[in-house]
Amino acid sequence: MTALKNDRFLRALLKQPVDVTPVWMMRQAGRYLPEYRASRAKAGDFMSLCMNPQFACEVTLQPLDRYPLDAAILFSDILTIPDAMGQGLYFETGEGPRFKKVISTLADIEALPIPDPQKDLGYVMDAVSTIRRELNGRVPLIGFSGSPWTLATYMVEGGSSKDFRKTKAMAYDNPQALHLLLDKLAQSVTSYLNGQILAGAQAVQIFDTWGGNLSAAAYQEFSLAYMRKIVSGLIREHEGRKVPVILFTKNGGLWLESIAEAGADALGLDWTCEIGDARRRVGDKVALQGNMDPTVLYAKPEAIRKEVARILASYGKGSGHVFNLGHGITPEVDPEHAGVFINAVHELSAQYHQ
């Protein structure tokens, strides 16, 4: 494989020295970019973009052609695993993801297969290898998956939910059934991420989008325990380099200490945490990724730069910080403002790495 021309993202995740703080954005390949909207129109719909390796590669690279980002992230969806388990993923206009089959009984869960990454999710593996080849060493490629808890909520609710009442009711009424589902999902996520690593992903992130909606005790039992299981089963070295693992629980700021014990190299932070406090709490164990409020990108350029400067100062000197948003970039953001953000991180962070 081609040598990396820019490895500061991987170095920061491993707390090795860097020249400037690396930066990428969750959902950096997305609807805020006119070129993405053109590709999506050409593909026909969102799932056609995800399931065609050439289209997935095209949109993954678009933000890198526009901005000096330090990492690419595979263009895909967290719900590819439930779809490969036979749940029948589809998208309703204005409603988000839905499933034709909904999980409601132990029998439903027992019948679920564990997908084979090559056979059942081969289009994702093909996309990873295609993107890696096209990147040609420009920057590292991040693979990803949803967490078992987050995937389970979609499978039990049948789609998005505000209160996760069916999944939470299952947790309290029938924990045995939910644990079986989460265990199957943990096995599936482990093999899926390992498949991505073997196909060329140089770091992986687990998105625990809905873990922060659980009580502290339920988070430990139904979310963190399964992420810990996944982390322990991942390939951690490939092609002569460490493969860093990032865990991101949105609204998980109260539990950083226990997340830091899960075995990952880095924790993603949403914008409700103060990154300097997070560093004092867990910075000796893990790197940190984040954590600007994505809506700051609607503000004027000077305000964006000011907030970048504040977060950099809060983290302070030294490596171990990957700058990112606290969640995905939103569709109405002006692409010029995203550029201001990325350039500000590089320009204003150099002083912290001298």
Swiss-Prot record:
Cell compartment(s), UniProt: Cytoplasm
Functional summary from the UniProt entry: Catalyzes the decarboxylation of four acetate groups of uroporphyrinogen-III to yield coproporphyrinogen-III.
Enzyme class: lyase
Main localization, broad class: cytoplasm
EC number: 4.1.1.37
Catalytic activity line of the entry: uroporphyrinogen III + 4 H(+) = coproporphyrinogen III + 4 CO2
Family stated for the protein in its record: Belongs to the uroporphyrinogen decarboxylase family.
Protein name per UniProt: Uroporphyrinogen decarboxylase
InterPro entries tied to this protein: UROD/MetE-like_sf, Uroporphyrinogen_deCO2ase_HemE, Uroporphyrinogen_deCOase
Subunit annotation: Homodimer.
Record-listed substrate binding positions: R27, Q28, A29, G30, R31, D77, Y154, T209, H327
Keywords: Cytoplasm, Decarboxylase, Lyase, Porphyrin biosynthesis
Species of the source: Pseudomonas entomophila (strain L48)
